[in-house]
Amino acid sequence: MSSSTWISIDFDDYRHLPKYSGHPTRSNKQHITSANKELSEDFLKGMTGLENWLNSNDYPVTFFIIADLFDNTTFSNWFQLIINQFPQRITIGNHGLNHRSWSAWPEDVEGFNDALVESNKILQQYCGDNLRPWFRAPAGYIAPWMAPVLAKNGFKVDSSVNPSWLVKRKAGKANTWSKVEQSMKDNKIVEISWKTKWSLPINGPALHIPILKTIANGTWKSSPVVDSLDNSLKINGQITALYWHLLDHSRKQSTWSPPLP
């Protein structure tokens, strides 16, 4: 069986993190819809760093974008420049309307559906032919009840599952990652879970956490060749999913780059 690596970048600013908004217990009191929509200094630096990185290689990459970022003119204008510069390399996935941690709250089919409809509408407007029916739950909070709603809204791929025991709570109360994966399968959605090592996370924040960082770097560098998800899905081979955050590109004075093979 052929194998490939799919790389993606989550477009989260600090205001989107569960620490600040969207989570019933982890967030401060600021309501998610009233959060300041201005881009943080590090996010702006990350935009510069990402552009530098894109100019340094020819990897195909997926951006998982939170739709409310397009409320910001600076981001919208920059995004259009990037898409115009790299139209064949970039695909876009849905990372939610405003980064609500859905599975941490009581089941809300109607609210989730409304958020998908609105976020899809916004992304279709700005992303055009680069948009794909791919979803990544904000902060990886995904529960089985969300799969039928994703299917109803035309999604074909989900990449929300981080199959590590350290974050199993994100599947929702009394749920497991296997239940999430089965629900996706039952609803004819391809689940592409994140790569782990020894059941430890190696994506996203793990790239910068002591010990996990060392494990992640070695695993990433030994991963299969990078290919677009469009191609990998056609081949129906084994897919290794690796991802990081746009904010990572603000590190090292906007010169940080992921430890890709």
Name every feature range the model reports, one short phrase each.
Residues 1-83, 132, 249, 255-257:
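Active-site beta->alpha N-cap acidic-glycine motif
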Residues 7-9, 94, 157, 244:
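Active-site flanking residues adjacent to catalytic metal/cofactor-binding acidic residues
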Residues 21-31, 98-110, 205-210, 257:
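Surface-exposed, active-site-proximal loop segments in enzymatic domains
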Residues 40-44, 109-117, 219-223:
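Non-membrane alpha-helical structural segments and their capping/turn regions in soluble enzymes
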Residues 59-144, 167, 187, 196, ...:
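Metal-dependent polysaccharide deacetylase catalytic core of the NodB/CE4 family, i.e.
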Residues 103, 169-174, 251-260:
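Histidine/acidic-residue-rich catalytic or RNA/ligand-binding cores of hydrolases
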Residues 129, 136-241:
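Active-site-adjacent pocket scaffolds in enzyme catalytic domains
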Residues 237-261:
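Active-site and substrate-binding clefts of carbohydrate-active enzymes
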